Amino acid sequence: VGLNTALRIGDVLSLQWKDVYDYKRRRFRAHLQVVEQKTGKTNQIALNDCVLHALRQCYNGQKADEYLFYSACHKNQPISRSQAWRIVRQAAEETGVDGNVSCHSLRKTFGYHAWKQGVPPAMLMMIYNHSSYQITKRYLGIIQEEKDDVFYHVQL
């Protein structure tokens, strides 16, 4: 969910089933409406097939006010940020991902791969709800080698 929505971990952990599942219509929602904790800005996010598949795998008649990522000790509470970090780190190790991986890596990875697939940075700025283009550029993590590739491939 975090990887395919580009949400900050605090917003991911605060998600409840009512946010992703329409209990009246008995189906998953097409969009997620989030008021971002950090900025207070509202963001509407389309739930792609990867997210919907994961949600369908996990949904088992949970109550509307249950958290998607609930604490095993306190079911009426989400897991902690530190527990989320441990889960992400373990998943990175198990899949052979090296380097400094954190929960925020999920958000940044979405943008990087979107950018590599041709999504303009201005659109990513809107998706991220960033206040400046500079922040978005930093998220994309463009390295010198990638800048060099532009010069090698654009020959007028």
Language model segments and positions:
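Short pre-functional
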Residues: 1-10, 33, 112-113
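Active-site-proximal segment of tyrosine recombinases
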Residues: 11-13, 100-101, 111, 119-130, ...
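Conserved tyrosine-mediated DNA breakage-rejoining catalytic core shared by Y-recombinases
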Residues: 14-51
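Catalytic phosphate/metal-binding cores of nucleic-acid and nucleotide-processing enzymes, i.e., regions
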Residues: 15, 41, 75-76, 96-97, ...
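Catalytic-site neighborhood detector that most strongly recognizes the C-terminal catalytic loop/helix
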Residues: 34-36, 128-153
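Active-site/catalytic core of tyrosine-dependent DNA strand-transfer enzymes
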Residues: 48-98
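Residue-level marker of regulatory loop/turn positions in helix-turn-helix DNA-binding domains and
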Residues: 80, 103-104
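Active-site His/Glu-centered metal-binding helix of metallohydrolases
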Residues: 106, 110
